[in-house]
Amino acid sequence: MALKQKGTDAAADPKKRRRVGFSGIDAGVEANECMKVFIARNPDEAGSANSTSLQPFDLNHFFGEDGKIYGYKNLKINVWISAISFHAYADISFEETSDGGKGITDLKPVLQNIFGENLVEKDEFLKTFSKECEYLSNVVTDGNVIKHDASIDEDSAVEIVRVELQGAAAFLYCRLVPLILLLVEGSTPIDITEHGWEMLLVVKKSAQASSSSNFLVLGFAAVHHFYHYPESTRLRISQILVLPPYQGEGHGLRLLETINSISESENIYDVTIEDPSDYLQYIRSSIDCLRLLTFDPIKPALCSMVSSLKDTNLSKRTSSLKMVPPSDLAETVRQKLKINKKQFLRCWEILIYLNLDAEDRKSMDNFRACIYDRIKGEILGTSTGPNGKRLVQMPSNFDEETCFAVYWTQDGGDADDQTVEQQPEDLKTQEQQLNEVVDSQMEEIVEIAKNVTSRGKDKLSVSCSV
């Protein structure tokens, strides 16, 4: 970690006198504004601003409650992470330091908290490109190749390798932790000492003799096998990450497909994902919908539901229709495809949408009405009105427009306790907020349906006719 303090004119000329004055309280600088993180794939990229830049979700949260750094003028923190060994080197420069009332932030412990033992000095960092290149080869050699995709480049190939999180593989995971902390919001390192952890690595093998390393890690997934009563195993995807230089190339898709293949071949009970991001859920639902499109057991129930949405008139609310599959069908899907019930219900709505004519106003209104009823039931339950659940929009530090709270009101009690009465205007606001949630979910369904359509036109041809 290099610290560089730039000289000033006053320091260069001792005859110049500084004027005495009183400066204001140091406002500090946000870490997001002065810190950048790069990936270096070779020694030439180390220390270069031309390296691939990472986009951490939020660097501020590493620097105290307000996310600011104090006591530095024109502070710049540039960190390079080796794509070979995942060691890190930090270059820190500033013009001067001064205590403006908030102290001077000690940068070293904060960076060590992020990068741990990966953080080294520049000379050692440069040596890791040649000295550390074999350890990844050892991890890959000890693992099992699950999937092999020939690359468009003649000198390389992409493989997915399955390794147990112990020994060298556990050591590799520890080196990947800083990337997880930087790029996955709300993430925490897994406990690799716990039984049942393994990792799927997306690696690129180089056939070039001049390459400093035989393999590059493009991405990975950490999965956990845990007991399910009475005598089966569930598989949970805890973390999945494709490194920024290789995102958009389909590696995350390959990881999920490989996990699905493992779950079927080993008769896992089902597959779940721990706190998936919106984009990961988008990819997951697209994959599962494509699998379900060719799963014959769902077609009779799916076509029946599509037909009901075409024929029923829900606009006047004189009738109701629950857009749910038969319970035995959800169990069949779990047994054969290892899709858990919650995920299947999500995909079920997308499959129905795919089989409706978007130009048929009646069908689409009925579809939206079913989505509305489901969401209203999930949020408010069956008890609404003067004494029941209520949905209100609440400001938050994350998003003032899309955060809601649910609370319960009831009749009776002291007058002082009845601080909330549901007036007509309250019901109108609640209806508006419910519709906003419904609109958001409708947008998600439409986007996933578009992706499924673009990737599976041949599979859609054998679905229910519209």
From Swiss-Prot:
InterPro entries: Acyl_CoA_acyltransferase, Hat1_N, Hat1_N_sf, Hist_AcTrfase_B-typ_cat-su. GO terms for biological process: subtelomeric heterochromatin formation. Its main location: nucleus. Its EC number is 2.3.1.48. One of its GO terms (molecular function) is histone H4 acetyltransferase activity. Pfam families: Hat1_N. It is an enzyme of class 2 (transferase). Acetyl-CoA binds at I240, L241, V242, Q247, G248, E249, G250, H251, G252, L253. Keywords: Acyltransferase, Cytoplasm, Nucleus, Transferase. The record marks W197 as: Interaction with histone H4 N-terminus. The active site is at E274 (proton donor/acceptor). It is found in: Nucleus; Cytoplasm. Acetylates soluble but not nucleosomal H4. Belongs to the HAT1 family. This is Probable histone acetyltransferase type B catalytic subunit. It comes from Oryza sativa subsp. japonica.
